[in-house]
Amino acid sequence: MAIDENKQKALAAALGQIEKQFGKGSIMRLGEDRSMDVETISTGSLSLDIALGAGGLPMGRIVEIYGPESSGKTTLTLQVIAAAQREGKTCAFIDAEHALDPVYARKLGVDIDNLLCSQPDTGEQALEICDALARSGAVDVIVVDSVAALTPKAEIEGEIGDSHMGLAARMMSQAMRKLAGNLKQSNTLLIFINQIRMKIGVMFGNPETTTGGNALKFYASVRLDIRRIGAVKEGDNVVGSETRVKVVKNKIAAPFKQAEFQILYGEGINFYGELVDLGVKEKLIEKAGAWYSYNGEKIGQGKANATTWLKENPATAKEIEKRVRELLLSNQNATPDFAVDDSEGVAETNEDF
């Protein structure tokens, strides 16, 4: 619908004044917004990248990854860091739990010599460091491990047994308000790892909740629920975990999709095993009996041998990955924010843990 000429002039003057006062790009028509196409970083799992709909985790946004103990939360974030570093990005790890294992991180492909690491004394210090790194515009990925370990200064200086109701929730709420805009401006991805707690006295519905209040749930563009669903065995030896990740909230594509993959001890996500499964599913890799073939060439008898062949032939693996991404990501459209619902995820609570 055409706008009146006088209104057009008034609008142009107003836009000019806003840009003069707040800088170029402070207001623009949505169709002209250069950030409409969200840049993403791979999670290290092809099936999870596809479940996310955009091909990975979105830059300039807040992401929450939560789950029970030993479910693979830290492993997943280290795989994201490794993928980002391979693209030449700078990453930081805020180790509030003081439990980061550099030897394990190196095994997962992380360049620990170029990984920024901080072990803050208080929750406020950790969040201020995040904000300073984001405002610098020089850091691309920040991981905070974990929200539950972000202890307010007042609690650290107080006695054990003192009541500090809602302190952590208030601290997180204030930090989210401050961080969201800075992350968007600097196009920095901020990943929070979170733990699960049980609400007492819940008779119906999900008794699980996450720590740190409600602010993180609202500000996060993506929330991932990660669970260990079984063991990977070689004979009688357990060599890894079968893992399921559910996309509980997604502001960049359709939510509630799931991905299942293996996390192998000392190796991380079994990417090439996923590639074989998805290649067969999309008919890019032919399977006849126990034999796997690609473009008429046999690549292995049994999944383990086919996986090993792809590891040894990275150019072919990259070609198959590219074709799988084109097939499975091309038809996925973004959904509006109002279509996103946390109802099937972790229950909301006003309590602070």
From Swiss-Prot:
Keywords for this protein: ATP-binding, Cytoplasm, DNA damage, DNA recombination, DNA repair, DNA-binding, Nucleotide-binding, SOS response
An example GO BP is:
regulation of bacterial-type flagellum-dependent cell motility
Q: What is its main location?
A: cytoplasm
Coiled-coil spans are: none
- GO CC annotations, alphabetized: cytoplasm
Q: Where in the cell is it found?
A: Cytoplasm
The residues the record assigns to binding ATP are: G67, P68, E69, S70, S71, G72, K73, T74
Matching InterPro entries: AAA+_ATPase (IPR003593), DNA_recomb/repair_RecA (IPR013765), DNA_recomb/repair_RecA_CS (IPR020584), P-loop_NTPase (IPR027417), RecA-like_C (IPR049261), RecA-like_N (IPR049428), RecA_ATP-bd (IPR020588), RecA_C_sf (IPR023400)
Q: Which GO terms describe its molecular function?
A: ATP binding; ATP hydrolysis activity; ATP-dependent DNA damage sensor activity; damaged DNA binding; single-stranded DNA binding
A UniProt-annotated Pfam family: RecA_C
Q: PROSITE patterns attached here?
A: RECA_1 (PS00321), RECA_2 (PS50162), RECA_3 (PS50163)
Sorted alphabetically, which NCBIfam families does this protein's record hold? tigrfam_recA (TIGR02012)
Functionally, this protein is described as follows: Can catalyze the hydrolysis of ATP in the presence of single-stranded DNA, the ATP-dependent uptake of single-stranded DNA by duplex DNA, and the ATP-dependent hybridization of homologous single-stranded DNAs. It interacts with LexA causing its activation and leading to its autocatalytic cleavage.
Return the similarity comment: Belongs to the RecA family.
Q: What is the name of this protein? A: Protein RecA
Q: What is the lineage of its organism?
A: Bacteria, Pseudomonadati, Pseudomonadota, Gammaproteobacteria, Enterobacterales
Give the gene that encodes this protein: recA
